């Protein structure tokens, strides 16, 4: 797996090409295959085959969250970057499912689209397919979600949706449950409330 320091170069260097398939576990946020990130490996995976994976969900936490722009930008950089020469497909490495289906739909389309597309246009088709109609109110709601809560920005290493403070240690200023997770509003909560009202 491509995560943090793994796989170490000394471990995989002498393995024959084709004997290893590496999953770049968090490629939508912390790609290890060669582009800038806190997990970056300057040499990518060398001669080894690998999959561009979306982690999206940590610990089965339920809540709205996604990185649409990063998912698209990072994936389409593989088309022209020589470090990605041995990319063989995509993978899903989530620690929980049954949430944020829009992100899984978007990820699933990537191998079928040879040229980069914008999330705004893609969301229009997603709404038509999901609801069987081109309702302007639903379109507005999803465009708002795609620009806010489903668009965690580059540089924000938050691991999925906000954690419940009820799961954290008792404290007067508790804002998260895990010590390693970054919890901050990268969107305006009022935009999410507005989007929610558009669904009714």
Language-model segments: what does each one mean?
Residues 197-200:
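Short, intrinsically disordered, charge-balanced linker/junction segments flanking boundaries
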Residues 1-146, 151-159, 167-189, 194:
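Catalytic-core regions of glycoside hydrolase
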